[in-house]
Amino acid sequence: MTSAEIRQSFLDFFARQGHTIVPSSSLLPDSPGLLFTNAGMNQFVPIFLGDRAPDVSKWAGARPAKDTRAADTQKCIRAGGKHNDLEDVGFDTYHHTMFEMLGNWSFGDYFKKESITWGWELITKVWGIPAKRLFATVYSPDKSKNDPSDFDQEAYDIWAGVFKKEGLDPAVHIVHGNKKDNFWMMGDTGPCGPCSEIHFNLLPSDDEVEGRKLVNAGVPRCIEIWNHVFIQFNANADGTFSPLAAKHVDTGMGFERVAGIYATTKGFKDFSRDPSNYNADVFAPLFAKIEELSKKTYNGTVPTRREGLGEQENIDIAFRVLADHARCVSCAIADNILPGNEGRNYVIRRILRRGILYGKKLNLATGFFEQLVAPVVESLGAVFPELKERQDIIRRVIRSEEESFGRTLEKGLQLFNEGAKLLLDAHPIKGQADVPGVGTITNIGGVTRFLGGKFVFRLYDTYGFPVDMTQLLATERGLAVNMVEFASEMQQQQDRSRAAQKKEVIVAATEGDNTEAAQPTKFIGYDRLTADAQVLDVVKTDKDLFLVFDQTPFYAEMGGQTGDHGVVKIDGQTFAILATVKDKAGRFLHKLAPACAADVARLNPVGKKAALGVSPLARRAISRHHSAEHLVHWALRKTLGTHVRQAGTSKTKERMRFDFTHFEALTPEQIAEVERLVNSKILSNDKVEAYETEFDKKPEGTLAFFGEKYGKIVRVVDIGGYSRELCGGTHVSTTSEIGLFKIVAEMAIAAGTRRLEAVAGQAAYDFVEEHETALKAVTHKLNAGPQDVAQKLDSLLAHQKELEKKLKAYEQKAAAGLADELAAKATARDGLKFVTATVSIDNQDALRSLGSQVLHKLGEGVVTLGAALGDRASLVVYCSPAAIKAGHQAGKIVGELSTKIGGKGGGKPDFAMGGGKDPSKLADVLKQSAPGVICSW
């Protein structure tokens, strides 16, 4: 069987058992707290939790059968967070960042008997895996460690029957496992249950006793190929476990693992070779392309260490890294996870850059990585069609990243190699020795060389060289990185950055746990701008004063939206509220002017009634910008593609800023299209609705953002049914209230991240009016209508260019004449001619050109010219070969002269430049110091 046939036979087998075959879900998980989709069961979590009825037959792209049974092959990424296999990829033959998980599920339908017997039938009867080489694990709690529940007698009995039917001893083929290996939990609370794994003995011998010893021993010759999880309990908050009303089955099988074993063992028949997932033909197109590009051959060697590797070992590691990482990055980009600087996007950037680094080890030129996309599509495009559909954008994103990182990599590698060489060449002595600027050597039970954290941080901060790349390169050379020192340097940089921003940081004055226990403020400002409230607290910091109320119509700064300002009236006295922020206890802090402190103290407002009023003009302006931002997000995704994701926002009354993932600058046409789309929706007067729903019941296509903390109940902002986002901010009621929208700037803020700045409503009107006023002034100056301005400017610029050309010709002619005059005044000595002069000239380039012309006319000699250029003196010196041979050095002459006029200079023996801050001394210094005679021109 081919890999594709193994995958298809799995799906067809379960289709025959009444399972609905569903497509793989996106690698971009629906849960914002999850980095990537990392297991087949992720998309079924709402069903397991009871938040959604089983309805898989109605899912888009499904091959329908029963709603309570499902099977699929799921793309998964495990790199970063809890599951992180990145650093192992390439060094063995079974770790991957991206892999497929084959699985079947029962939602309150069949249970252990069907799951186990069907699984056994597939792998032994359909695929032909020898039964004698298989072992099953069952849950057996270790009560000394307070493992939950009881021994899984039901699973044991089913397995015992299976093995007896094969003529095998259950006592040998069934292995007991504790909570660590054989009890699955979704979290500290919630659905859970025992699991039963199937392990495959890959030793050359099929000795059952020897095979049993290797189960869960962490050796590649006996590995788990399929896990059956039986979800039958609920873990309660008090530590107890109660039975679920509906029992479920969740299974997962590593596709590459099974396909690799099949290929290695020639159809599960020859167990003489070490297993390797990379033997699966799903990797063949990639290996073929890498061999073509590198002119090297993959031999499948596997290292037993991380340093001192042989040439072929390094080649084979690089092949595996590139094959794996190309699959991972391509699939991620196809699912709109682009390389970036934060969260999951940064993980993809790390993986791509790690791949590029290993490409350098194969001497592959910049641009090679995007050529690996085609073989990924060849091997996976049939089962994951989004790879075919988005092949062009995948290549373009990778190309942009590769070109950007290529510049970083060259400089970073050079500096790393220099530092590593200094450290490795240093002589180890007893105790500790320092290698200045690089690191230390310690001799404690052996020699350890540490790259200093400051050195590593300089690579990272100045040259953008990722620290994990430095760690990888260091390990290969037997070095370690002082990560404690690196972390300290990073913290200091962050502290400096925060200080430089001079951003107001609000710290609640309440000490200890009181802030956490404080009563959260009730926000009632979505539909009203005024309210009566009770003062609960006065909060003071070193320089700020805040009031806390039981409820408020003031929106606190969050989600990129600036806080409201307005007024509060207490006992007839009115105070201006300058800003509103929220503390970690959920209290809204209403900032007053520091000058109010005495009045507030006399008033003693705690417990008193207050009348609150938000500035309606400011709130409307902020809301316009917030709703416009949602439209911008929609328009960008429509114009550029669904890979566009929000990466940061700011909404104030003056303007909005929207940061988003994209790999290249927007063209003027794209900017115009985004602006047109937004304004078209403003004109269509679409309804803007906000409503609350359960997170798992939000409408399909609703955008949520990684890193945000969403509760069970979320707020959806829906604009016309085409833009839906989870959002807690304030908005207009209809799009027409935005009025007008204008983009004012588009720029890059980081590799893979762009920024749009825009204005809406009155701010947009003011922007247009300002530009109209400027245009009217220009048309008046040009004596032309607005439609003729461009043509008139083109004509003026062409005329200017012609005049500049004539001026340059005149200046060259004048310079040639001046050069003749200077050369004619030269003095001769010892077979050389000398010209030393101060000249009146416009710029440095003209001075250099004049000096060169004079020397050319002299033949052999020394030319020293000075000029006052603005408030600085400038010098050039030229020496001919004969002059240099006679001991004259241009660099030395310039250095001495520059020092005397308050500056510095230097250069080569034949040409040098310099200058100083005091042009008034120039003529005297030249007269006293320079060879030859002084002229002034």
Curated annotation (Swiss-Prot):
Q: What is this protein called?
A: Alanine--tRNA ligase
UniProt xrefs under SUPFAM superfamilies: Class II aaRS and biotin synthetases (SSF55681), Putative anticodon-binding domain of alanyl-tRNA synthetase (AlaRS) (SSF101353), ThrRS/AlaRS common domain (SSF55186), Translation proteins (SSF50447)
Q: What class of enzyme is it?
A: ligase
> Would the keyword tRNA processing turn up in this protein's UniProt record?
no
Superkingdom in the source lineage? Bacteria
Q: Which family does it belong to?
A: Belongs to the class-II aminoacyl-tRNA synthetase family.
UniProt keyword annotation of Cell inner membrane present: no
